[in-house]
Amino acid sequence: MSNSITSDQIWQPDHVLALWPTGAPQAQGSGVLHEPQLTVHLPPVAQANGCGVIVNPGGGYRILASDHEGLQVARWLNQYGIAAFVLRYRVGPTYPTSVSLLDAQRAVRLVRSRAQEFALDVNRIGMLGFSAGGHLALAVATKGDQGDAQAEDPIEQQSSQVNFAVPVYAVTNGAKRGRKADEYTPTDESVNPQTAPCFIVHTHEDAIVPASQATLIYDALLRAGVKAELHIFNDGEHGVGLAAGDPDVAEWPKLLLRWLRRRGLLAHEERCAVRGSVLCAEQPLGLGWLTLIPKHAQHPIARTFLHKREGGEFLIAKENGPIVGQHTLQIHWISQQAQYDGSGRYSLERSLMYECAVDIVAGQRLDIRLQAHDFV
């Protein structure tokens, strides 16, 4: 029995976009290795949420791992309503990484220029990359521009700034890595307060790109006040992609979805501020949490910490607020003590929870009045 794959079984992209239809700048020849492009992978129309991600396969700026770091990632994103665009960027030794960056920036401009066609929100376009592709995503995130308003090419008038970046086991600084400093420019040194928020993934076991490359960029983002989340898994070789064979490391795509949701990147509706109060027997809780979990699976969760010193009042700022509509409200009461001391005394044997359905309305207060027996 033959397991060979025939030519008509090889997957073909939905749609291909040449980055420069009339020829790429600095091209050293013709053919696939000299003609950068995007393959377009769109979710079902009814499922699309307006978020778009450009996917950069890795390969050390020499090859492109286009299956498990390209197509398969795009199809996974599509399952969650996210439009995906796999980038074929030019690689060495023919092309320096400055040309790869030129291709990636052009890809962002091209996607943004056709946002209406692809039902995208121009403020929710990100870049996800693996290894060298992750370095490329960070280079774009730290070197974006607003476009050239005077350019004859309308695509060049578009911004190359991404709204978020996802570097996965990425090189972030070649010099500090100790290899190929000329190819892997120091992205950490280019981080500034305008750098896009980042979701960073790495593994401790990576013997090709050490996990210190991930902490390097995270520390730079932290210093600059840029929103970032870092996950370093113990297990996992370099190049795991979505990590289909490792149930633990395979949690990172799920964590990414949660991060995108929490940042409001999976919803087109505007967030709102929520002000209100929580009292139990007309008294504020010592310490607790108020959490708003939306009925819509892709709307962001909102929450705030409750402290007795606020007299039961709370405010969730618009930036971190919910989207109007139906939510499950949870109040977690974790201590009757508003201020711990050195006595080590206990006030609650376990955290207590109250839950109910609420309808969030912009500008309307959320005042909750409870009794101790309402908690479980």
Q: Can you name each region flagged by the protein language model?
A:
Residues 194, 199-202, 206:
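Short beta-strand/loop motif that positions the catalytic acidic residue
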Residues 297-316:
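Short, acidic Ser/Thr/Gly-rich low-complexity loop/linker segments typical of extracellular
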Residues 106-193:
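Primarily recognizes the serine-hydrolase "nucleophile elbow" in alpha/beta-hydrolase
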Residues 41, 215-271:
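C-terminal catalytic histidine-bearing segment of alpha/beta-hydrolase fold enzymes
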Residues 65-67, 72, 87-122, 243-250:
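Catalytic nucleophile-loop/oxyanion-hole region of alpha/beta-hydrolase
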Residues 207-216:
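Conserved alpha/beta-hydrolase "acid-adjacent" motif
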Residues 49-58:
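Short beta-strand element of the alpha/beta-hydrolase
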Residues 345-376:
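Extracellular beta-sheet/turn segments enriched in Thr/Pro/Gly and aliphatic residues
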